[in-house]
Regions:
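Active-site-proximal gating segments in proteases and membrane effectors
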Residues: 112-134, 225-231, 235-248, 252, ...
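A hydrophobic membrane-anchoring feature enriched in long, contiguous, low-charge segments
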Residues: 23, 38, 174-240
Length: 307
């Protein structure tokens, strides 16, 4: 399911990004500036794929290459290392390291995986949370360590291990990489709109030229309207699809913890978290990337009753 949602996300944002890039190239071309997108290697790619060499297909190839480059960069350990430093995340030390590693080793033993494949990190924050990161990292916040007992902490770690085993974090990281490219193209389009608006505010006071400026500005406003509609539709689709996929992954991770014999430990931990609030209301639940805690606790209890 995660891979399918990733493909859908890429297609949706890729299509909209290609349209926006096409508009950017077309608007710049109206000023007599030659396109820089029609490079020989892009034409060669299209010809090898048997696709027509047209402005829009050229933009599609560029967006695909931008996506691919961003995805590769996001996978590089140095990039992930920068994120850890930026968030003040580090490896545990001393007694804390012994405690966490013992908990983690027990969870991995239950799952039949090598604990050395993964690395534990600690973030010195009072927030009660933990999350999987990249391909092989789990970050535990100090607030969670202080709040949970050893049994409950193992339940949380089992849940996070599921995200790594099922590559949920890899899919999430890939989606983030594509969204970064998409947002960069949106920013480029808005900057172009700002430049055009500034130039228009000067030209509209010049006789004769002002008529052409008004016509051109009308076309630009129409294009901007189309882009905003496409942008809204893409975001609306993502807001529904991404949380849906995330909620499926959360339930699967809870079941994974149950299968390791840590379902009740996780349920106890989640029950504690309900004291700090839960997702209420249909709309909030629809767009939330986590199911309501009370539903997750109930599901874990149901699984325990089934044996």
């Amino acid at each position: 399911m995660g891979f399918l949602l990733l493909i859908i996300t890429g297609l949706i944002y890729g299509a909209v990004a290609s349209v926006i890039l096409f508009f950017i190239d077309w608007i710049i071309g109206l000023f007599g500036t030659p396109t820089i997108l029609e490079q020989p290697f892009i034409v060669d790619i299209l010809q090898r794929l048997g696709l027509p060499v047209e402005s829009f297909t050229i933009c599609c190839v560029w967006v695909a290459l931008f996506f691919l480059t961003s995805i590769i960069l996001f996978q590089l350990p140095p990039i992930q290392g920068l994120f850890l430093k930026f968030k003040n995340i580090s490896k545990p030390q001393g007694d804390l390291a012994v405690y966490l590693n013992n908990c983690w080793s027990d969870v991995c033993r239950r799952a039949g995986v090598d604990p050395d494949r993964y690395t534990l990190y600690v973030q010195h924050s009072k927030q009660i949370n933990a999350f999987a990161l990249g391909h092989n990292r789990v970050v535990v916040l100090m607030g969670l360590i202080d709040e949970m007992n050893e049994y409950e902490l193992k339940g949380i770690l089992a849940h996070e291990l599921s995200h790594l085993v099922h590559r949920d974090t890899t899919y999430g990281m890939t989606s983030a990489a594509m969204l970064n490219v998409y947002n960069a193209i949106i920013i480029a389009f808005e900057l172009l709109m700002l430049i055009i608006t500034t130039v228009y505010n000067v030209l509209r006071y010049i006789p004769f030229i002002n008529i052409l400026a008004v016509v051109f500005m009308a076309i630009v406003i129409f294009i901007r309207f189309i882009v905003r509609i496409l942008h809204s539709l893409a975001n609306f689709g993502y807001v529904l699809l991404a949380p849906f996929g995330s909620r499926i992954a959360e339930y699967r991770a809870d079941r994974f913890a149950h299968e390791l014999g840590l379902g009740q430990a996780l349920a106890s931990a989640l029950a504690k978290l309900t004291r700090y609030g839960d997702t209420e209301g249909f709309i909030n639940q629809l767009v939330s990337d986590h199911p309501p805690l009370r539903k997750r606790v109930a599901k874990l209890y149901e699984l325990s009753q089934q044996g």
